[in-house]
Regions:
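Active-site phosphate-binding strand-loop segment of PLP-dependent enzymes
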Residues: 114-191
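Phosphate-binding glycine-rich loop
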Residues: 37-84, 98-101, 108, 131, ...
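Generic structural signal for small/hydrophobic residues in well-ordered secondary structure
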Residues: 28, 51, 69, 85, ...
């Protein structure tokens, strides 16, 4: 880098760009004109129904953030202090923050070459924690960059062990594995 380069403003490189079209603008205006900006209303009800349908699940709840969804999932499953939750190293802070919010301990598991959690390392980590007498009531799996984790490689074993699978599928809405959509592999998911 030269001195001349140091004086240039940094160009921002976005991971992804938001796409807002007339469809989204009309939906916002429709919600504002309906008088149902808060608490919720028909637009949110329709959104929840569409998400549930697309994910092939019975229920979907719109919350303020993916972090809130992960936090709520952990609380609903009774996960808290003294629990150990394996989670991918390749993630956004919200994933591990939600685990910390409930007093549980995140146990980091390295990623495979695709960026998602390494199935073999995940199962080995679970086995090691259980062998040490640790309580592992759940795992939190992160789907990255529009790709689902390799759920068929580990979900059946987790189910055998009675370990809840929680999906952080915020980056994978619309993705699937063998026709099964993101958000439908575990006991709960945040999209």
């Amino acid at each position: 880098m030269t001195n001349a380069d140091a004086n240039k403003p940094n160009e921002r490189i976005f991971l992804s760009l938001a796409t807002v079209t007339e469809v989204e603008e009309q939906a916002v205006v429709r919600a504002l004109h309906s008088g149902w900006v808060a608490p919720l209303g028909p637009e949110v009800d329709a959104f929840e129904a569409e998400i549930a349908k697309r994910c092939g699940v019975d229920h979907a709840l719109a919350l303020s953030s993916g972090t809130a969804g992960l936090h709520l999932a952990l609380l609903a499953l009774g996960i808290g202090e003294g629990d150990y939750i394996p989670v991918s190293t390749m993630t956004f802070a919200a994933t591990t923050n939600a685990i910390a919010y409930v007093g549980a301990t995140p146990v980091f598991v390295d990623a495979a070459e695709d960026g998602n959690i390494d199935p073999e390392l995940l199962l080995r980590t679970v086995d090691e924690l259980l062998a040490e007498g640790k309580n592992v009531p759940g795992v939190m799996i992160v789907d990255l960059f529009g790709r689902c984790a390799d759920y068929p490689a580990f979900a059946p074993r987790l189910e055998e062990l009675g370990i809840a699978l929680i999906e952080d599928a915020a980056e994978a809405l619309g993705a699937s594995v063998d026709g099964q959509p993101a958000g439908s592999f575990g006991r709960a998911a945040a999209l």
